[in-house]
């Protein structure tokens, strides 16, 4: 049916071109979802007294306010699905607290959870606490610092659900959207099949950037210690998938790291912890934060290998004719 409709449309175009007539646009029907969004997105508003529109025409023309735009003006920093903004806040919090005595709670209070509720660093830390500011309502809240001689276990007990509710949530202003909302970390931050494409793009981009860079990266080429948790066949598949002959570089990027300012340092792209290249060669070393999406070093390679395996099976099952037909179908949709 779609093919017949396309042919009718093409005949209409050819007929119009032959007769040099104007082509009538096809009607577009909004879906139910689009109609619902339009209904609740726009709000009627009255005409301005200084409007250039004649009085007799005002009753025939209705003006509307775009509630989405209005909300974005009042809450500039509220972006639930902006991963880049989330990572920027995490990075700023890590840099801000890198040299102070603070023991993050893995579940409730850490740079990731703070950033997911809209908090970012504010001014400088005192001897007893670290202040943070909401990027949206500009409210201020503080996190206590670990004092010399304090027991770490007792300190981390304080950084728990109580501080999450009283400080991280409770210190937002009543009308602040971050008070009732939080970035969906399972969907936006942690690794999943839905966001795996972002990891593929990141690794491809980093390979191009590092390989084409003028400064040589002092990483031992094909050092198996970087990717000791992978078999030789697995690292070969992954390197071939990313079109990179340097196994060490692929292994480094699979761990979530990227080249830092100093040639012998790398930095995680998700928790922003730093490590030297020498430390990475120790098989027991894990430089990521406990809440980091790359803390389980085997997770990302496993997901990519499963994806590669599915592609290989699909290619081997299809004959040449079937592959050509599938390619033709894809091209038709484009």
UniProtKB/Swiss-Prot annotation:
Key word Lipid biosynthesis present: no
Gene Ontology biological process terms in this record: maintenance of RNA location; mRNA transport
GO cellular component entries: nuclear membrane; nuclear pore nuclear basket
Highest rank taxon of the organism: Eukaryota
The entry's keywords: Membrane, mRNA transport, Nucleus, Transport
Signal sequence interval, chain numbering: none
UniProt GO MF annotations: zinc ion binding
The protein, known as: Pre-mRNA leakage protein 39
Organism whose genome encodes this protein: Saccharomyces cerevisiae (strain ATCC 204508 / S288c) (Baker's yeast)
Lineage, uppermost ranks: Eukaryota, Fungi, Dikarya, Ascomycota, Saccharomycotina
Encoding gene, per UniProt annotation: PML39
């Amino acid at each position: 049916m779609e093919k017949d409709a396309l042919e009718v449309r093409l005949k209409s175009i050819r007929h119009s071109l032959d007769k040099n007539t104007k082509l009538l646009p096809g009607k577009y029907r909004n879906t139910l979802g689009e109609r619902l969004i339009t209904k609740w997105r726009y709000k009627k508003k009255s005409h301005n007294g200084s409007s250039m529109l004649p009085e007799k025409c005002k009753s025939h023309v209705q003006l509307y306010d775009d509630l989405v735009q209005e909300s974005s003006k009042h809450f500039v920093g509220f972006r639930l699905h902006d991963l880049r903004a989330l990572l920027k806040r995490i990075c700023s919090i890590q840099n801000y607290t890198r040299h102070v005595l603070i023991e993050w709670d893995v579940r409730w209070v850490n740079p990731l959870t703070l950033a997911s509720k809209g908090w970012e660093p504010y001014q400088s830390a005192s001897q007893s606490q670290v202040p943070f500011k909401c990027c949206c309502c500009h409210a201020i809240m503080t996190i206590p610092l670990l004092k010399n001689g304090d027991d770490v276990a007792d300190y981390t007990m304080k950084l728990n659900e109580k501080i999450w509710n009283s400080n991280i949530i409770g210190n937002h202003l009543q009308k602040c959207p971050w008070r009732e909302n939080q970035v969906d970390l399972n969907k936006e931050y942690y690794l999943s099949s839905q966001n795996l494409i972002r990891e593929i793009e990141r690794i491809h981009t980093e390979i191009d950037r590092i390989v084409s860079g003028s400064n040589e990266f002092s990483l031992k080429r094909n050092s198996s210690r970087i990717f000791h948790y992978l078999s030789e066949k697995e690292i070969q598949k992954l390197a071939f998938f990313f079109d990179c002959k340097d196994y060490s570089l692929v292994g480094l990027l699979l761990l979530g790291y990227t080249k830092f300012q100093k040639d012998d340092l790398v930095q995680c792209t998700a928790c922003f912890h730093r490590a030297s290249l020498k430390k990475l060669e120790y098989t027991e070393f894990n430089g990521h934060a406990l809440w980091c999406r790359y803390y389980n070093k085997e997770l990302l390679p496993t997901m990519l290998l499963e994806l590669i395996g599915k592609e290989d099976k699909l290619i081997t099952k299809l004959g040449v004719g079937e592959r050509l037909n599938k390619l033709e179908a894809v091209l038709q949709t484009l």
